[in-house]
Amino acid sequence: MTKKQREGQGAQQIGEIMGDLLAQAQIKAALPPPKRQTKKITPTGLILTERDQKLIEASAEIATTPPGGEDMAFTHAVLCQVGLPRAKVEGREFMRQSGAAWVNVQAGYLDEGHGPVLQPIPYGVMPRLGLAWVSTFAVRNKEREIPIGDSAAEFLRLMGMESDGRRYTTLRKQMHALAAARLQLGFKGRTYNGQPVQQFDAWVANKDTQQRALWPGVMLLSEDYYGSLIESAVPLDNRALHALKGSALALDVYAWLAHRLHRIEGRGVTLHWKSLREQFAQEYKGKDPDKD
């Protein structure tokens, strides 16, 4: 190969490389910009996600700023000790027990416009936040009739959640389940037995006219549940509920701590792993539930 041929081949290779680089640059220019890195590394090397940072900021605000009037929330004392299921339950009944407290939830029927429809057992974040908001209004205003907003979007906002199609579906499903559920709450010889919700107009859409589903607007608590709630309400902080809304387990741990710390006087209390497992891990089953 002559010198001239070698130079020509080298120029061709350089041209191919430049062409490849140009093509790659054009492809990258057409792609959306990379997402902003939301992770943060602390001086000790701990990696914090964006959610971790928000939780730390919320906890700092709660620790340094006393709750205002709108920050105060309430829930039933027994539900602080034994909450609703955190994941979907197969079947029509759910039982949870911890120490002297226990809860039994039974699925019920709700008329959705064309006769009775069996509802699932309420589970997850949505019924926890919904029940806390309803209980808060009842305790603050000494009222059994609870206004739950003029729309589903407003009720989601009241619970500190953004409104989107997926949340609308979850809200409808879980509010129907909660309204239909039969609840038994027991503690040291006393049992509440009934339905927390006495009346709830189902969130029904008119499929024939394609109208948007009508939001019921009002929920009526049963007299027995209302009386039990007023007698044993536990104060919570709405800011904490909103910060922890991404996890049913986190909400359960917070409500449990709020209830326990509210009662502790003088000497501290030693908590053993066995009691914590009984409190929060009854739903973990399988080959190695302790590890899970």
Task: Report each predicted region and the residues it spans.
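Charged, alpha-helix-forming regions
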Residues: 2-292
